[in-house]
Regions:
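Short active-site oxyanion
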Residues: 30-36, 108-112, 161-162
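Short glycine-rich anion-binding loops that position phosphate/pyrophosphate groups of nucleotides
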Residues: 16-18, 87-91, 168-170
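Beta-strand/loop-alpha-helix module characteristic of Rossmann-like adenine-cofactor folds
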Residues: 2, 6-7, 118-191
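Conserved helicase motor
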Residues: 59-66, 139-144
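Glycine-rich, flexible N-terminal cofactor/catalytic loop recognition
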Residues: 1-63
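Short phosphate-binding loop-to-helix
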Residues: 62-77, 96
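Short glycine-cluster motifs
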Residues: 77-141
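Alpha-helix capping/helix-boundary segments
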Residues: 42-44, 89-90, 119, 170
Length: 191
């Protein structure tokens, strides 16, 4: 009896605003895989529709990724390939996907990254700041005590450039926080 070959888990970056930024390799992989695991299937259907991709689309978001990981692992053990995509940018960069990758590695399933857009790297590249050393922190904390802890870390004399994500709804509260704390920072805000 032949041993069944396992599928592959692809981590595919998606555009961060312009669907024409999707790489040809990313399009090919999304076309070829058996299942696309998407952060938000409604938003992903828009991109996939523009790219004329009609593969099986399933949700994989922060509220279900632990439960769905087992399902996707079983599918890959049965020989199917799965691609993880996020609403915009690279999966696992402040988006779901880490749990599935961890489970894939633990189960000996091959994981392949398909590079493309990453909002943090794109913003850093146009900031004009020294990028010989930078730290991506994810989303800026919401609570004042946590914000102060992060600001203290930044003030310790480290010369690294810090990059944070923030929602448009909260950006002004972050700027107000820096002003109130007399942070004396150079800021680059990107959308």
């Amino acid at each position: 009896m032949d041993e069944q070959k396992t599928g592959t888990l692809y981590i595919v970056a998606t555009p961060i605003g312009n669907s024409r930024d999707m790489s040809p390799r990313g399009v090919q992989i999304l076309t070829d895989v058996d299942i696309i695991a998407a952060e938000d299937t409604r938003r992903s259907m828009v991109l996939l529709g523009k790219l004329e991709i009609r593969n099986k689309l399933m949700s994989n978001h922060k509220f279900n990724e632990y439960g769905k990981a087992k399902y996707f692992i079983n599918e890959m053990k049965a020989g199917k390939s799965v691609a993880v995509i996020t609403d915009a940018g690279t999966p696992c960069i402040s988006d779901p996907g880490n749990e599935l990758i961890r489970a894939a590695v633990e189960n000996g399933i091959r994981v392949v990254g398909v590079p493309g857009c990453c909002a943090a790297v794109n913003a850093l590249s146009i900031s004009g700041f020294d990028l010989s050393s930078f730290l991506f922190y994810g989303f800026f904390p919401r609570e004042t005590a946590d914000r102060r802890r992060v600001l203290m870390m930044m003030r310790k004399g480290d010369t690294a450039t810090y990059a944070f994500y923030e929602s448009p709804k909260r950006i002004m509260s972050v700027i107000d926080f820096f002003i109130e704390e007399n942070a004396q920072l150079r800021l680059c805000l990107c959308n």
